Amino acid sequence: MAIHLYKTSTPSTRNGTVGSQVKSNPRNNLIYGQRRCGKGRNARGIITARHRGGGHKRLYRKIDFRRNEKDISGRIVTIEYDPNRNAYICLIHYGDGEKRYILHPRGAIIGDTIVSGTEVPISMGNALPLTDMPLGTAIHNIEITLGKGGQLARAAGAVAKLIAKEGKSATLKLPSGEVRLISKNCSATVGQVGNVGVNQKSLGRAGSKRWLGKRPVVRGVVMNPVDHPHGGGEGRAPIGRKKPTTPWGYPALGRRSRKRNKYSDSLILRRRSK
């Protein structure tokens, strides 16, 4: 994605950047409305995820993560913006008349042809089982459970690598650096997710952040003791504790949040790099 600078006419445009303008004109049968669920609250109305709320209304686009139109070629008709994710999406017209959205593979353009199946070419945008891919293939939209649809490497610019196949399992290196085992029968899409430069974009002003549904983040050290364990003191006082804590007194910044003895621990050969 090309990053463009605004002319410095106002303070917000002076600091902001914008990516390539991709319009969105979604099909009515592939979208539906969704309610904002609590803005970071649980069923009792208590904040469980801070700094969420507001934001622009969104229509959800139905994305085909399963890619179960087997052995039927499809043509990329449009490349569209999706407000629900940082990757772009493609509208595919299949030969049997079916129309679906998929994640936009990097380098794909309007008019390209894709297909999914067991014996399809190893080319960008095609979906096939890991057992039919050569080692070193760059992939995204990877299934964890057979037939459930892709769950791994779906963000903008995400790409995983097939590094080994042995027995019933394949070894993948994920974008986080984690190395784990997955069934060879699971499917994945060849290539990298598009919109690679999204993390280089600067919003430029607070209002752009609010449009995304993200509220301001306030440091605990500038609060009162009633609001945060780090609060209080005269002037710029230290937090008064050995380690930083959350507003509810639990250890923060480094505490592992993964559940112990999870079923997938045996499938992870190397933890993600920090």
Swiss-Prot record:
Print the organism lineage. Answer: Eukaryota, Viridiplantae, Streptophyta, Embryophyta, Tracheophyta
Describe its partners and assembly state: Part of the 50S ribosomal subunit.
Report the family membership.
Answer: Belongs to the universal ribosomal protein uL2 family.
* Name listed for the protein in its UniProt record: Large ribosomal subunit protein uL2cz/uL2cy
**Organism this protein belongs to:** Nandina domestica
Q: Which is an annotated Pfam family here?
A: Ribosomal_L2
Q: Which gene encodes it?
A: rpl2-A
The annotated regions of Polar residues compositional bias extend over 7-23
- InterPro entries assigned to the protein according to its UniProt record, in alphabetical order: NA-bd_OB-fold (IPR012340), Rib_uL2_dom2 (IPR014722), Ribosomal_uL2 (IPR002171), Ribosomal_uL2_bac/org-type (IPR005880), Ribosomal_uL2_C (IPR022669), Ribosomal_uL2_CS (IPR022671), Ribosomal_uL2_dom3 (IPR014726), Ribosomal_uL2_RNA-bd_dom (IPR022666)
Gene Ontology annotations of biological process type = mitochondrial translation
The record's region (Disordered) falls at: 1-23, 223-274
Gene Ontology molecular functions? rRNA binding; structural constituent of ribosome; transferase activity
Q: What SUPFAM superfamilies does the record tag this protein with?
A: Nucleic acid-binding proteins, Translation proteins SH3-like domain
Keyword Ribonucleoprotein applies: yes
Matches recorded under PROSITE patterns: RIBOSOMAL_L2 (PS00467)
Q: Where in the cell is it found?
A: Plastid, Chloroplast
